Amino acid sequence: MKIELQRYLKKKFPELYPPDFSFECNDGWFRLLLWLSRYLEMYITQQNEMAKSHPQNYLPVKQIVARQVKQKFGTLRFYSDGGNQHTETVIDYTTFISGYICEQTGNTIDVGYNHNGSVEVLHKDLAKNKNDFNFVDDEELRTILKNI
């Protein structure tokens, strides 16, 4: 990920990303990471406020600290300490969604992957082997999305 985008995330979410943290993925997943970071920050803040005012009903949530954010087997991996079962579920869902977004461009149309070699989710124009390219969406949906 470009250094400017990394700096932005670390500046906006200093509790989530330590100063020496480095992202090991491409720019296409920046917005996905931005939205995830916003949600995690909001959720932890709200839960902890509720735990203070209603301790009988809410448990505090330990601050999440990212340990590694990278691409692995074509999806985003977000390894961290802290959080709770809910934040783990949100992170798992983000991993799932990343498999439908081009890691390099952020495109969501005409995205797929190759079976041979390293697995990356890419726009069809960036595919290394066009003969082994597998779209994540079926042809009917790709046609609809291109025409709307």
Regions found by a protein language model. Name each.
Residues I144-I148:
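Intrinsically disordered, low-complexity regulatory segments
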Residues N116-K130:
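Cysteine-rich micro-motifs
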Residues N107-Y113, N131:
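Short functional micro-motifs and their immediate structural scaffolds
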Residues A127-T143:
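Short metal-binding segments enriched for Cys and/or His
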